[in-house]
Amino acid sequence: MSKIPSVNIKALLDAGVHFGHKTSRWNPKMASYIYGERDDVHIIDLRQSVALMSVALNAIYETVKKDGKILFVSTKIQASDIIAEYAEKCGQYYVNHRWLGGMLTNWKTIAGSIEKLNKLDKTLENEEALMGYTKKEILNMSRKKDKLLLSLAGIRNLNSKPDLLVVIDTNKEHIAINEAVKLNVPIVAVVDTNSNPDNVDYPIPGNDDSIRSIRLYCSLFADAALQGLEESMKASGVDMGAMQEHTDKGLTSKNVSKLKQAKKFSKTKNIDEETNTEFEQALNDADENKNSDNA
């Protein structure tokens, strides 16, 4: 049986996941996910991050295991390349530049744009066909193609709505989240101390700005998806040697049953004692190191 990836307190601390925003910028709806504050910066309760990450990774695993499609979304600069890298690694879909309004709710229009992109691609790759165009016309076609690729490269093989949306910054991607909610698409999202966790089925409290944090999240998400893919292929009797080829092409389109919503661990009693101790000790060690540096 495939093993769903997991994460511990130390890995999250090393990636800076515990650093929230300045206390003046917080969203009160995140109160239950905040451990405290240090130097006017909110500290995220990593005990809950560990527990809720596990729930989110299981949701990703189960979605792909059942041949579902996952759409990764983050258009912020520091996450753009990382999102694309890990979505491609696990054969899923992504939007990493501008979210076009209606990408989910007005799919017919988006599908038309994808068709236009594919036609431009086909024309520009056909040397014989290009002989009928002027250099200026070819240049204009290339520019149109590049513009479409920025928004559509990660979804050009997506033929229907995704079964799960994975978001890094809920504030920046609020339009994508609203569209997913309208279509009843479950949402996994990293929620920082200035985020609104409403409408997020699988919240993961954590820093959504740090490149190290974002890379850690995406690595875990991709690993969970790959484990789900492996289970799906085994169940279908697919040759595991074809794993890489299958991943490169993306997953087939099948309906997936609605995933159960994640339980929100808003109280520390829901977290095991070992994780409690590990987190508190790690914070104490960090304070001691800071004090010794200032001595």
Swiss-Prot record:
GO cellular component, one term: small ribosomal subunit
Annotated segments matching region Disordered: 247-295
Keywords, alphabetical: Ribonucleoprotein, Ribosomal protein
GO biological process: translation
Disulfide linkage: none
GO molecular function, one term: structural constituent of ribosome
PANTHER family named among the record's database cross-references: 30S RIBOSOMAL PROTEIN S2 PROKARYOTIC AND ORGANELLAR (PTHR12534), SMALL RIBOSOMAL SUBUNIT PROTEIN US2M (PTHR12534:SF0)
UniProt family annotation: Belongs to the universal ribosomal protein uS2 family.
Listed name of the protein: Small ribosomal subunit protein uS2
Native organism: Rickettsia africae (strain ESF-5)
Classification of source organism: Bacteria, Pseudomonadati, Pseudomonadota, Alphaproteobacteria, Rickettsiales
